[in-house]
Amino acid sequence: MWVLGIAATFCGLFWLPGLALQIQCYQCEEFQLNNDCSSPEFIVNCTVNVQDMCQKEVMEQSAGIMYRKSCASSAACLIASAGYQSFCSPGKLNSVCISCCNTPLCNGPRPKKRGSSASAIRPELFTTVLFFNLALCLAHC
């Protein structure tokens, strides 16, 4: 019986406060010309349990590449992304691409390639393991 008490304490102290999910994203609401808004001053905390994704919009125009980034709800982001899919042709003039992602700062610059990624923890793997552990914990609490 004491094992259940320890498990309940562990779940209460470490898992339940973390159920309020908040993500950080890069945000520049106004289009930025040739500035991908990926420096620290553009980092924001998204609205807890509402804005669960980061969104990136890239428009290629004759003047240069325009960027807009923000926090978004998964529904709004996925609808916008799907709606503009036919206009997304990277490298072509007047292309508009909208992408959605759900890991911290995922709408920032592409990470620099550093040798083998086998030793690095991939965010999607970490998220999967985290949710699996949460499910196990809730099943036993």
From Swiss-Prot:
Keywords: Cell membrane, Disulfide bond, Glycoprotein, GPI-anchor, Lipoprotein, Membrane, Signal. Its main location: membrane. It holds the Pfam family UPAR_LY6. It is found in: Cell membrane. Residues 116-141 form a propeptide. One of its GO terms (biological process) is negative regulation of protein localization to plasma membrane. It is a lipid-anchor; GPI-anchor. GO terms for cellular component: membrane; plasma membrane; side of membrane; synapse. Residues 25-108 form the UPAR/Ly6 domain. The keyword Metal-binding does not apply. A lipid is attached at residue 115 (GPI-anchor amidated glycine). It comes from the Eukaryota. Disulfide bonds join 25-54, 28-37, 46-71, 77-100, 88-97, 101-106. Residues 1-20 form the signal peptide. Believed to act as a modulator of nicotinic acetylcholine receptors (nAChRs) activity. In vitro increases receptor desensitization and decreases affinity for ACh of alpha-4:beta-2-containing nAChRs. May play a role in the intracellular trafficking of alpha-4:beta-2 and alpha-7-containing nAChRs and may inhibit their expression at the cell surface. May be involved in the control of anxiety. This is Ly6/PLAUR domain-containing protein 1. It comes from Rattus norvegicus (Rat). The gene is Lypd1.
